Amino acid sequence: VRRIALLALTALACNPDVPAESTFGAGPTAVPEPASSSSSNSSSGSTGSTISGGSTSDAWSSSASEAGTGTPPPDFGPPGPAGCLGKIDFLFVISNANTMAPHQQQLLTIFPAFYNALAGEFADFDVHIMSVETDGGWFMGECSFCGDGCNPNGTLPTCGAVLDECDSTIGARATFPAGKESSARRCDLANGRYITREDADPFATFECIATVGSGGGIPLPADAMVAAVSDKLLGKNGYPPGCNQGFLRDDALLVVTIITDGYDSESSGPAEAWVKALTAAKHGDGSAYQVLVITSDRDTVPHLCGDYSPAVNRLRTFVELLPDGHGLIGSICENDFGPFFETAVEAVLERCDAYVPQ
């Protein structure tokens, strides 16, 4: 099934015009298993097992014979971790810099296949999906940008929209993207803050919250990530209910996706502090999260993005500081995000398999 899911991801990446399933939890079409009992699954991420040197009934007969002669059964050690069991919190941190609109569309093209590839691996795919503010501002500009969720005949600066404090708080749930090339409306979310399995069409809803537009303030992706998982915005440890109340669950795997075409030189603190913030949000468990970063590659050789720039890309430093395998980084200048997210599916599944819920 895992291989089928990845093939579906690749197929959609190559054929963006193919419509994706829009029902929550829908996965790729199942393919019947071969009838032969001697076949084996060669996928490195398979959760199945194959008994070598005989059939299943032979193995049971052998075990029964050993039991009859007093031979103790083999000790396979303690059971493995339970894994995340499909319970995943997805945090999307998407820059709204002037040049980011095309890259947001690339994400929207691949998201259904990424979602379905993961959904097809679990009997119960229980997700929270949240996009967050990266600049702490709300900029509508012309009222003509205003969509169905607000009154285009209203007056600036809100064009008649009803706003709250969370709409202009960095790291807070983005439910009303505003400005040029954005959704420019209040997104229709079942719980008002992030996508859950109660949302009938997660793909349409994701398109709304992820189309954050371009031309806002200075994007601060790392600051937004740190704020998003802070006790203040989550409303934990003595804080009143926050903008991101209920998003981060103690027993769910956290998957953070950062997409920006800059180095994020403006966010506060060293990259080490960003790692500590994620780990603290998961109660000190450094194995409870996976980070996916798509950023400029001008700091590498070879590179796809413009001229070489030797300045330190702190987002690359951030990924390199994460525990082995917990960070994945790709180039924002790739024409197709499909291969990156295909690798991301494998990384998330590996992290999920090893996860021990708290």
Region locations from a protein language model:
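N-terminal non-cleavable signal-anchor helices
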Residues: 1-5, 32, 52, 133
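Divalent cation-coordinating acidic motifs and surrounding scaffolds
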Residues: 71-358
